[in-house]
Amino acid sequence: MSRDSIYIAAQSGWPVLMMAGPGVGKSMWTYAFGDTMGMPVETLLLSTCDPSDVTGLPFINKDDQKSLAKPTWFRNLQEKRGLLFLDELSCAAPAVQAPALRVVNELAIEDEKMHPDTMVIAAANPADKAAGGWDLAPPLAN
């Protein structure tokens, strides 16, 4: 996928997955893209995350209902347009990939949404080049 294709896809609201070997500049390109667009970049280094880093920590609210305390990155992307960068997606455990899929597809956690102009870019290494990596769930890979 060319840089122009990534640019067009991201601007059109489609999530983008950059799949390439380590060290080719996927992360650097994403930060430069965010800078060019004048958008803050919120990064989740998924290889070091657990599910609560993606969805937030559970708690019991004032109505005795289970809820989630949303992570800072999510609250930041609710307030203003920004770019969510899911780095090292192929090194994320399946338990982290699952909540990441919902965030990518719905730009939401529970019933709260991110800013409607939020862009999502993910970076992954091919399975044969991802040290300690996992196969991507088909919905994420597509």
Language model segments and positions:
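AAA+ P-loop NTPase catalytic core and its hallmark functional loops
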Residues: 1-142
